[in-house]
Amino acid sequence: MSALGHRLFAAVYDTMMAPSEQGALGELRDEVIGHARGDVLEIGAGTGLNLRRYEGVERLVLSEPIAPMRRRLAGRLGDARVPVEVVDAPAEDLPFADASFDTVVSTLVLCSVADPVAALAEVRRVLRPGGRFVFLEHGAGEGSRAVWQHRLDRPWAAVSAGCHLTRDVAALLPAARLTIEELRVLEPHPTPAIVLPFRLGVAVAA
């Protein structure tokens, strides 16, 4: 997506997401962030919709590579209940030493990274042994929905900052040496059917 496209997407993102955020999606974010412990990294923090949900963690680092999103995120830093550091970095190339974090969080991010396999390898690298990767991601459905997701994947990505409809993040975790501890497949409403289902899970660094 072009720089102009990123600016426009950042400008409308919160408004576009508001109906879902005020419903089940907001509750799912609460659940995901409730798993965060110790030193925490959130990849693809976007406009900061999770920020106010963090409590009782030792350290919080928010990674966001898109400048217009970071500017929106900066406007929410006053909502934080814990010390926060914001870093300009993509999920595929994190500027942290190995074994730096107890928890890595990803909510609606891995659908749009350029290389989800590389991103998950980085997640595993920066997690301490026994650390947790907590995620809420949408992606590949089944049956007729999967057919339509494949048909619409390219045009959808073109207008939604590279968001893909066909990824199954949970299926990529074992290759990254992340062992699934909990996984639920969900259909929160109101959410467009084309982006369903969502997968909420916890995986442990092997």
Task: Go through each PLM region and give its residues.
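Conserved beta-strand signature within the Rossmann-like core of class I S-adenosyl-L-methionine
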Residues: 130-138
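Short alpha-helix
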Residues: 161-177
